[in-house]
């Protein structure tokens, strides 16, 4: 495979010492992986990975607590990958995976993170050519709005 892809920027950032893997959380991972070794490697580096199955097993409150444990007192950049949302609600992405969060769940999670010191953020993987009736664009804008409100502590 290729070393640099849309699915590997954070691995490369860890390899290049640009981010601290012990202060990195992945929430909602599910479905097929390009390389299962990437998941093992991330865990070995200290990345906190909460799969979608882990989330539902742990429950909302324990999941949020875990995120706070990792990110407490840390300047944090927030990337929201739109394919974390189920394609029923956000079909316009290059890698749709069934079984993701619904929009309300995503909003609730983002709002619960309002005590984290977010210093920036983005919404990635929105692909208008794959979208249906601008659904994904609307969801992406909604998620970006929620993130901005959380970053400015407006809930």
Stretch-by-stretch model annotation:
Residues 1-155:
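Conserved alpha-helical scaffold segments that buttress catalytic/binding sites
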């Amino acid at each position: 495979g290729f070393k640099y892809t849309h699915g590997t920027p954070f691995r490369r950032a860890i390899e290049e010492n640009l981010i601290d893997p012990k202060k990195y959380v992945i929430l909602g991972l599910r479905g097929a992986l390009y390389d299962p070794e990437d998941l093992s490697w991330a865990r070995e580096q200290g990345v906190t990975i909460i799969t979608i199955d882990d989330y539902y097993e742990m429950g909302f409150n324990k999941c949020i607590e875990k995120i706070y444990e990792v990110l407490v007192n840390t300047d944090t950049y927030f990337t929201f990958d739109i394919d974390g949302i189920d394609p029923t609600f956000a079909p316009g992405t290059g890698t749709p995976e069934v079984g993701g969060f619904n929009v309300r769940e995503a909003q609730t999670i983002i709002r619960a993170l309002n005590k984290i010191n977010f210093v920036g953020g983005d919404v990635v993987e929105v692909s208008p050519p794959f979208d249906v009736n601008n659904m994904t664009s609307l969801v992406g804008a909604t998620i970006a709005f929620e993130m901005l409100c959380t970053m400015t502590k407006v809930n």
